[in-house]
Amino acid sequence: MSNWKPNIPYNDLPPLPPKQDIESKTILKRCIAARASLARLKQAAELIPNQAMLINTLPVMEARASSEIENIVTTTDKLFQSLQMDTERQDPATKEALQYRTALFAGYESLTSRPLCTQTAIMVCNAIKHPYEMAIRKTGGTALKGGNSGNVVYTPPEGEETIRGKLANWERFIHESGDLDPLIIMAAAHYQFEAIHPFTDGNGRTGRILNSLLLIEKGLLDLPILYLSRYIIENRADYYRLLLGVTERQDWESWIIYILDGVADTADWTVSKIDAIRRLFEQTRQHIRTHAQGIYTHELVNLLFEQPYTRIANLEAAGIAKRQTASKYLKELSDIGVLQEIVIGRDKLFIHPRLMELLRGEGNSFTSF
């Protein structure tokens, strides 16, 4: 029985692995389904001819949803617009959500030089909270309150030495549990990181980035394209209820099944979204080739799908055309209905409305040319 009390720092947080069975028949059955869905996602990503299409779009959607879980609310449109604008013109919520994307990429790059570890978590949290410097908590006073009641529902461990010790155990569990499926490791490690709550802010977002990095490190994905925060947003009450269920009753099975179902649901959703983007890419390519043959190149079509908003400078940077010619190309693409010109402040942007429609919505249909 847990000796946990909501108002007392949980310095007795049990280490990993749990004493409870986390490989029950039910868990393993759900794990097989989630692994199959992830394998389909990995294959779908490999079949996209230009990986930038995924790496520039799906992490932005994950950044928006993961930030929304923490009540940092912006829109998909604003995020993609802001990628093409000066940072000083971004509103605070959009800027913080984009920092999540920056942190995700920084974590992804770090896997080439060191395994997932406490230092990775510190680096990721610092990128999320920039310009504030984040370090392992040294003082007490951190407590999590219920959204409606305002009552304290959980007080994480206190003391830097205690927290670092629990993170060291978390790290060992990730790397020394080879007999466990990586998805079960991810689910258990995610609970533990949330329970340790090592920083004064940014813990939830850091933990969700670490999920993606763990899947890449274990070889289940090649790119950080799992949009798991979408599932958590849709099932947010269950997310917090099941986290607390592990703390109160050591109910690991319900929590792990929730995460496995989320991985399967999200991977299947993303495969369908990738398929829709591929169909739109082919339609766009054919439409430009038919109605603007003089400017058609494969490089130009690729660029239009790397982000839903394009500007003249993007064509210049890609070596497709000089400024005056690039302006002519974008005007012609607007004339044939591929792009739509908009002006935001001093910025002239060209939106691919059909691509934006796909990225903004749940559905996978789009208006044909």
Swiss-Prot record:
Pfam families: Fic (PF02661), Fic_N (PF13784), SoFic-like_C (PF21248)
Matching InterPro entries: Fic/DOC_N, Fido, Fido-like_dom_sf, Fido_containing, SoFic-like, SoFic-like_C
Domain of life of the organism encoding this protein: Bacteria
Chain ranges of the Fido domain: 111-261
Miscellaneous remark of the record: Present in outer membrane vesicle formulations which are used as vaccines in human.
PANTHER family membership: FIDO DOMAIN-CONTAINING PROTEIN DDB_G0283145, PROTEIN ADENYLYLTRANSFERASE SOFIC
Protein's name according to its UniProt entry: Uncharacterized protein NMB0459
